[in-house]
Design a protein with these regions (language model features):
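Short, hydrophobic/glycine-enriched beta-strand segments
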Residues: 9-16, 20
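Active-site alpha/beta core segments
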Residues: 36-147
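Histidine-anchored nucleotide/phosphate-binding helix
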Residues: 37-41, 159-170
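Short acidic-hydrophobic, aromatic-tinged amphipathic segments that line or gate anion-handling sites
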Residues: 202-209
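Short glycine-enriched, charge-decorated loop/helix-capping segments at active-site entrances
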Residues: 22-31, 124-128
Length: 209
């Protein structure tokens, strides 16, 4: 689908941070290529929200926090399965910073997530325990923003969880494919697209070329 944002739309820019781009600790293939697309898209939107992965050192989701475990293994934690990741987006480190070429001066809000040591957080709306809200849903409703355009990294984790939670919260959701990249762990990109279709999450292309 093609699109033209209106006053009730918001651009949700997910985790465009150094550690998720080439050269970072948890790079998404071609993650840096979303930046110029997102910059151009953002100029179409009056309302923009950013998310930022913001982990303390020793976070439960880090493989290094579990003796004998390797990145991309899964373990069981209090709220269910947890994929273990390389250390990434540690608070105050260069890897946690937004990409320097991300140019969205009118972004109104930054949602930091994953800062609780024992709960991971993929979604912009809820921690992975599925009970702890970030406050984003209320922020959007208070401003009459009813349709979310989701972009960023990684398509099959933080973008996916954010889009799904937004849909379940009653928002209309569009994922802009060419402004996302996936990491694809065990077929997770395919599963993401199937989930979007089942939940009524639309997809679009910015097609800025």
């Amino acid at each position: 689908m093609a699109f033209a944002p209106d006053e009730n739309d918001v651009l949700l820019v997910v985790d465009v941070q150094n550690d998720f781009c080439p050269g970072g600790n948890l790079p998404v293939p071609e993650g840096d290529r979303v930046v110029p697309v997102i910059n151009a898209l953002a100029r179409r939107f009056r309302h923009v929200v950013l998310t930022q992965d913001w982990h303390p050192a020793g976070h439960q989701s880090f493989a290094s926090s579990h003796a004998g475990r390797q990145p991309y293994e899964a373990i069981e934690v209090a709220y269910g399965p947890q994929v273990l990741w390389p250390d990434h987006c540690v608070q105050g480190t260069p890897g946690a910073a937004f990409r320097a070429d991300l140019d969205i001066p009118h972004a109104a809000l930054v949602i930091r997530k994953g800062f609780r040591p024992h709960i991971d957080s993929y979604s912009a709306f809820f921690e992975n325990d599925r009970k702890t809200p970030t406050g984003l849903a209320g922020y959007l409703r208070e401003r009459g923003l009813s349709r979310i355009f989701a972009v960023g990294l990684a398509l099959d984790f933080c973008v996916r969880y954010s889009a799904e939670d937004a849909r379940r919260q009653g928002f209309d959701v569009v994922v802009v494919d060419d402004a996302c990249r996936g990491i694809d762990v065990g077929g997770s990109v395919k599963a993401t697209r199937e989930s979007f279709a089942s939940l009524g999450i639309a997809t679009a292309r910015a097609d800025l070329d």
